[in-house]
Amino acid sequence: MTFSSARFVLDSFAVIAFLRDEEGADKIEQILREAERGKIKLYMHMINFGEVYYNVLKEDGETLANGIWAKVKNYPVNFLDDLSEGFLLSVTKFKGRYPISYADAFAAATSVEKEALLITGDPDFKFLERDGKIKVLWIRNV
């Protein structure tokens, strides 16, 4: 499998870091600019986008969460909603074989399907990268 440096998948960890101006936010900002210019393709599964929403909802309330939903939907990102049998088998294999959340398994499977680098700072993905299942663009040291 060949992973392209012109294709990236956003994990919720990366988007939340960007929204909260945490470590790595500058990298996300640069990637969003490149996607806006059409130099790269940027993807995110709706399951992971839902993770962003519920995280903001839990921490900051529904009004801000709704505003973030509208804001992120305008990012230069291709939002995916694939729930096909083949894709779900890929998701469940990641979840069954690695100590990651179910939502993280969607990000990993999307990365494989799109042959794209996964953008995250979540150390749970280290095992998948170590085993050569995905390639990661780390937004911070893990």
Question: What label would you give each PLM region?
Answer:
Residues F3, N78-L117, G121:
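Active-site neighborhoods of divalent-metal-dependent phosphate/nucleic-acid chemistry enzymes
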